[in-house]
């Protein structure tokens, strides 16, 4: 429920920004460039290691405190260690 409210507010905010830009008389070429720059926020980052339940081939593929579980399909699972 909270997530859907936040998504709705984000969409309304973007719509407000786009309509206010049109009212100020900016040309249509500005809006697509602005939207392309905003794409970076929503793209996932490339990571060096795999998170919990991510696919793996060996233990070094997984993040710290995770080990590769070799059941089919292979996935990264907690190796029962703690620390920083």
From Swiss-Prot:
GO molecular function ontology, one term from the record: toxin activity
Tissue expression as described in the entry: Expressed by the venom gland.
Record-given protein name: U21-theraphotoxin-Cg1c
N-terminal signal peptide: 1-21
Keyword Zinc annotated: no
Domain of life the protein comes from: Eukaryota
Pfam families associated with the record: Toxin_12
Record organism: Chilobrachys guangxiensis
Residue ranges annotated as propeptide in the record: 22-47
């Amino acid at each position: 429920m909270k997530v859907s409210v936040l998504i709705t507010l984000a969409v309304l905010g973007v719509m407000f920004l786009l309509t206010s830009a049109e009212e100020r008389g900016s040309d249509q070429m500005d809006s697509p460039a602005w939207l392309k720059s905003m794409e970076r926020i929503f793209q996932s980052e490339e990571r060096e290691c795999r998170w919990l339940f991510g696919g793996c081939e060996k233990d070094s593929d997984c993040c710290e405190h995770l080990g590769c579980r070799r059941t089919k399909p292979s996935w990264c699972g907690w190796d029962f260690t703690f620390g920083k």
